[in-house]
Amino acid sequence: MIYSSTEIGSRIAPVAKEFDVKKMILFGSYARGEASEESDIDFLYQHEGSKVKGLISVERFRQALEQALGKRVDLISMESLDVAYNQEHRKFIVDGIRSNKEIVFG
């Protein structure tokens, strides 16, 4: 199934609330309108002030999102962009997100 951004927002809202995540931004193929049945769903999320702290809670959050959507999910925290591997890597990620993004929660 290929979801609209509105459907994605509706499905992830309970999960985001459960984990106290304040904002989730859709990017990648779904944000560009190029998703296929095999596409994963890419999110940038704000973890500051949330219950998503540490590797185990990030994995629980990702699994809860995957269960809500029935699709694989990739996550990048907004805060992690500040410590990206190097400036070139950070620029690549940020430019890709900036050019095709949609706030779906928060």
Identify the role of each PLM range:
Residues D40-Q46:
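Short, aliphatic-rich beta-strand segments
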Residues M1-K23, R32-G33, E37, E48-G106:
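Catalytic core of pol beta-like nucleotidyltransferases
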